[in-house]
Amino acid sequence: MAAKIYDAIVIGGGHAGVEAAFILSKKNFNVALISLNQNRLASMPCNPSIGGPAKGIITREIDALGGKQAYFADQAMIQIKMLNTSKGPAVRAIRAQIDKEKYSQIILKAVQETKNIDLIEDMVFEIQTKDNKISGVITEKNGLLETKTAIITAGTYLDSYILRGEEKYSSGPDGEKTSNSLSNSLIKLGFKLLRLKTGTPPRIYANSIDFSEVEEEILPESNLNFSIYHSKKLSKQIHCYLTYTSEKTHQIILDNINKSSMYSGLIKGIGPRYCPSVEDKIVRFKDKERHQIFFEPETIKADIMYINGLSTSMPIDVQDQMIKSINGLKNAKVAKYAYAIEYDAIDPLQLKKSLESKEIENLFFAGQINGTSGYEEAAGQGLLAGINASLKLENREALNLKRSDSYIGVLIDDLTTKGTKEPYRMLTSRAEYRLLLRNDNADIRLLKYAKYAKTLTDKEIATTEAKYDLITKKIAELENQYISINDPLAKKYNLANSTSFLQLISRHEIDIKEIVGNFPFLEELSTNVRLDGYIKKQLSQADKMLRLENLKLPEDLNYDNVVNLAFEARQKLKMIKPLTIGQASRISGINPADIQMLMFHLNLKVVKNEN
């Protein structure tokens, strides 16, 4: 009997891996999902939360493209809130505390119930290729598994080490297995690897915390949820708590700074800029008297608290001193000590914007192995890699999201155009067109891509189209309805002339609900009307950039033949091989003069071809 050949093998069962597997199975491809531990699918070894600034919008985008993170987050959330409500709509985003145990359990159940996903608990030793094309993987228990495509989503498990003080040992997150052989296999295939570092804070037993010494964050009931297509509301909000480091905490850290794995030189990997360890914060910001520490429940039982803000690589004895110096933690009992973890990642400049390898056909990469941090960034990449693997199997063009379309598009463009030397975290400030990339419009702006990729059901498509039609018709209706000067509203709002309802609600002091009533998409209607001028300006800017994106660069372009290119520009262009003039213009070290020379060369080439 012939051995089974999979349509796709997904290596790694983290947030990227499960998204890739689910979207491929949704498109009726047979998938092998290989995980070191099936009981830790999409585990949360760091913060037990989904969302946050920019990141919450990525989760909404995943939902809009047919992915699963939003749906699963809604099933396992224990607290949810909208962030930045006092600011403009461009920066608002949802964040939810997640029951991390339930999250993994419901994903495992969903995988097991999906007929065309084979969940295999194993370790991949080697990537097999034939004629620079993926052909299979060699595993520890199952030997050779053949495949047409593969997606590597190995997270922080490649040649990973846990570090505390002078202690250093080979391990994956939370004491899981590490994979050394896969790193070696990638090196043999010619991939350049990066060495990165991240970390996680201690966990404390809740019954050992003195909650009378900390501030309780009490949130009102909420009807928020992540998923656009599957509504589930939270019945009860579980509370988080706020406290601060003390002067004593800072002194303990400074007195023992050389014992930190990071400051002793033991850690060689580069850590995340936007999620520093507590010792890094205290060394860098010596004038700051205290730093925020949040107690966040890891499950609905709330018996263990994640100590957000106390990430460290100090030895255990110093951690004990640090913990007990913080208000509320004088008698704390530690469930798990903090640690740093160092691991291999690939240089993402080796990838196309589809997340396919430039050198090995049908081999894709997604998640933290691409140099990112965060569950949301990983899931977004996993979804896109899965979609593009499916399109490759269908002999169709890859789906490449633009910077003006989505945060996922910004993320992938940054990775594949600029690369990264540290764990990349998505920030609102990274998006030039953030007013277009809002929390409330992910479904509408990504609908055309979901239709192309065939990742939504007919019902989901109809839901989004109905929403768009309803908003469009309401705006037209408001534009054509006028308030006469004798109307009570005219007197209430001091209107001297007949005014359209659209003009009236464009004024920020007006209660829009008074005018339109219980309109189901009030926030999006308000934003579209009140920020119409700003939105049009960003659309115009995006359109100008799109013109450059439409100027394609030949894949076989010989940059050595382009005259007057700066040496650095020539090197970068040869290495990155941008697909368009727009992408080339965003490469670090490429200046406008280089772009002009490139365009001049292409124009000359076109003329010569025509003659």
From Swiss-Prot:
Xref: Pfam families: GIDA, SAM_GIDA_C
Residues holding NAD(+): 271-285
InterPro entries: FAD/NAD-bd_sf, MnmG, MnmG-rel, MnmG-rel_CS, MnmG_C, MnmG_C_subdom, MnmG_C_subdom_sf, MnmG_N
Binding locations of FAD: G12, G13, G14, H15, A16, G17, V124, S179, Q368
Record's GO cellular component terms: cytosol
A GO biological process held by the record: tRNA wobble uridine modification
Cofactors required: FAD
Entry's Gene Ontology molecular function annotations: flavin adenine dinucleotide binding
Keywords: Cytoplasm, FAD, Flavoprotein, NAD, tRNA processing
Superkingdom of source: Bacteria
Family: Belongs to the MnmG family.
Subunit structure: Homodimer. Heterotetramer of two MnmE and two MnmG subunits.
Name the record gives this protein: tRNA uridine 5-carboxymethylaminomethyl modification enzyme MnmG
Organism (species): Mycoplasma mobile (strain ATCC 43663 / 163K / NCTC 11711)
